[in-house]
Every structure is written in structure tokens, then in C-alpha cells.
Amino acid sequence: MKTASYLCLLLNVVFLGTASAADDSEARTYGSTDFDASGSPEAHEVFIRGLLQLHNFEYDDARASFLATQKLDQDFAMAYWGEALTHEHPLWNQHDPEASRAVLAKLGQTAEERAEKFPTVREKAYLQSIERLFGNGNQEERELRYSAALGEIHETYPDDLDAAAFYALSLLTISHGGRDFALYMRAGAIAEEILDINPRHPGALHYSIHSYDDPIHAPLGLRAANLYAQVAPSAVHALHMGSHIYFALGMWELGTERNTRAFEAAVARQSNPDDSYGSQANHALAWLIYALNQQGMHEQAAEKLALFEDQLSRYGGNTQRQNFIAARASYLVDSQDWDSHFATVPVDYDGLSHYFVATDQYIQGVLALESADVEGAKTALDAIDGAEPIQTRSRRAMVPRLLHLALAGQMALAAGNTREALALMEEAAELEASVPPEYGPAVPVQPTAELLADTYMSLGEYELARQNYELALQSSVGRQRSLTGLNGAAH
């Protein structure tokens, strides 16, 4: 084996070619890094592309690059390490350890056999880290062991910026059960140290944004948010990521711009325009709808929601159904357009998670109350479930409980039981405020403090309404309905 040492070179990696390494007239830019790995110089260049794509969460493209590296140099051991990691999407809660283990098996059937293929102590340490990640134990246990291994690599090789970046990502990953600010700030601090050395490192920019994408810490992420899309414009996810910070700060115009670019880029990259949208396009479109609604651009939001409706009618899979449910709920709550034809589109819940069923049944319950259908509202309330108290730090896990209380409160109000209604909504608002804020569009789709504030407004209790609109805005900065309500309460 030949060793290609690039320790003195910061590669501004601009490649000619598609993710499959075929020639193409379009230059692709994914950022810059410097990573020493054993193998031929030609294969090393393609490996670096895969590494940068991996930091950008362009997993399919990264896998193609790592496979192309192996084709150029079958002994390029780190290319197998990279390929194995393309099946692990930690922040998306998507895991395929069997696929990763199959990649490792290409190197050998045992950890000892595989280690023999990695020529340096440092490269062996990288292998050992994923042996922990894809070894025995449940997902959380393996993630903790993996993070510890990356921490050891980072400590042993402090000049290895990619080790630092992957360690930062692992700290975000092990925040199980909800956002742990201590872990997130540790990750952010590591990312900042990388950016001081290499301000064009895509992993540092990317993981910095994830570390800070809550309303409290978002100002710390503005540098990365503004720069990331410039550094890695060929990565669809990089085009989107800045909006994590913009949403947390209520910067809706920038959020609209970034998600428009990301959505259009994702669709343009589809080999067949008639194929269903991929995850990147779906994600950007959902966020775009929310950003448009926060600017009062409900007609434009409806046009984008119609794209999800079209996907639902043409394909109807789990992905299409859950995307339509979430986007429809967001649109109806934010626009208050309860007479919209979107409200009547049927969706099959088979195979969908409790989160999406609860979200849609909440909407069905509100629609029933809008038409004075008490029995319909009761049916929806039962379908939401969430009747029992829950202890969790995760907003998403808490959603059924929050929406159960919110709908029950509205049902009590409709029945004239004002005291009961307020008690239920206050319980929901207090419960929601007890957990860290979520990034992106509002979770739950109806912020419960906003609902409580709306109720106080309807009762003429303007000071209590003001207090609760302000509470809602703490976790949903710049949210239009809360801002409008707050202005009304003040006057």
C-alpha cells in the first residue's frame, strides 16, 4: 500500500463528476478538509469527496464515492469505514446496522481480521470506533460506546479535525430522550475550535448549527448558518441547514430562501422527475410551508401543500402520508383556513407512528368542533390517546399528551365549561414549557401556550393572554399567530 499524506494541504474539494464518479460538466463543491489515509493518491481524492459528503449528510452520494474509492484501490481500508457509516443517520433516527455490518464483512469476518487491513494505529482506532457502533447491544448502548471511542481518537490526535467533528456529532447523538444542553454546548464548542482552524469544514459548520438550533443559543449559530450554503453549495442538506438557525430566530425570509433553494435542488437532482420526492426534498418543502405561513403568505403555502397532496395521491406510502399529515396540520393551524379543501383529504394511518396519528386526529377534532360535531370531536380525542400523564424530555414523545389536553380543553370550552377548559389548557402549557424547545416548525403543531392565550383573549382576559403569548414566543420565536395575538392583547 502507498500512503498519501495530505497533512499540509487543505483541500478545497471541487470535483468534476456526479456522486457515482462519472464524468460530468458540473463542478460540485462540498467544503474543505484534510484527512490522512492509506491508499493511492487517485483513490484518496475520491475518498475525500465521500468524507465531505458524509459530513453534509449526503449519504447516498457519499456511499457512491466510497464505493468508487474501493474500485480504484480495493485495499483503501478507510473507504470501507466510510461506506459503513453511510448506513447510519443518527440525527434522523435512521439506523441500518445490518447493512453496516455487511460492509465490515467485506474486510473480514472478525474484528481481528478487519484490523489487519488498516495499516496505521490511527486508522485502526477509526475501525475500532465503528466496531463499537455496529457491535453488540441496543442502539443507545452502541452510540455511547462509539462516542467514547471517538473521544479517545480526538484526545490522541488533536490535529485530526474530522475526528473532532465526528466526536461533536456523536455528542449530539447521545442526547437521548430530548435536547441535553450540556452535551449540545460541548459539541458546539468543539465545532467552534475546528472553525477557528478551518472555517470551510462542512462538518464543523453543520454540527455547529445543530448544536445551536434552539431559540436560546441560535445567535451563536448565525456565523455557520450564513456560511454553510456558500461552503457546500452542492450539498442539498447544506442549502437547508441555515434555516435551523433562521427559524429559531424568526428570520422567515431567509428561512424561505434557503428551503426554496434546497427543495428545488433536491428535485432537480432526481434522475426521473416523475419519481416520488426524496427525504431532502420532503424536509425542505415542509419547512418552506411553515416559513411562508409565518409571513402571512398562506396562498403560497397552500400552493406548496398541494405538492404534498399530489405526492400523496400518486404514491400513498408512509413517507407521503406522514408528510401530508404534518404539512396539512401546520397549514390549517397557522392559516386558520378550516374550510380549506385540504381538510377533507383522507389519509390512511396504517403503519404511521403515534406522533402523526395524534397530530392528524387533533386536526380532525378541531374540524369537528368547527362544525359543532361533538361526537366527532370525542372520537378524535380517543384516537389521539394521550389520556395518561407522561414523563419525558422529548417534545415529540410528549405530543399525544399535549394535543389530548389541548383538544379536551377546546371541547370543554365549546360545552361552556370555561374553568375546566382553562385548567386543561394550563396543564398543557405548563407541561410543554417543562421540556427544551424543538428546532424547526412548531412541535406540537398547536403551541399550547398560544392556544391558552387565544382562549384568554376570547374571554377578555387580556393580561393573561399577553403572558401566554409571550410564553409561546419563547419556544416559537417570531411565530405570526402569537405575535398577532400579543399585539391584540396589548391594545
Region locations from a protein language model:
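Amphipathic alpha-helical repeat scaffolds of TPR domains
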Residues: S40-R49, D75-H87, A115-G137, D159-H176, ...
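A conserved hydrophobic secondary-structure block that centers on an alpha-helix together
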Residues: F57-D60, N136-L239
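Inter-helical turn/loop elements of alpha-helical hairpins
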Residues: E58-A64, E83-T120, Q128-E141, I174-A182, ...
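Short, charge-rich amphipathic alpha-helical segments embedded
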Residues: A64-P97, T156-A165, H201, G317-N318, ...
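Solenoid-like repeat scaffolds
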Residues: Q70-L72, H154-T156, L195-I197, N226-S234, ...
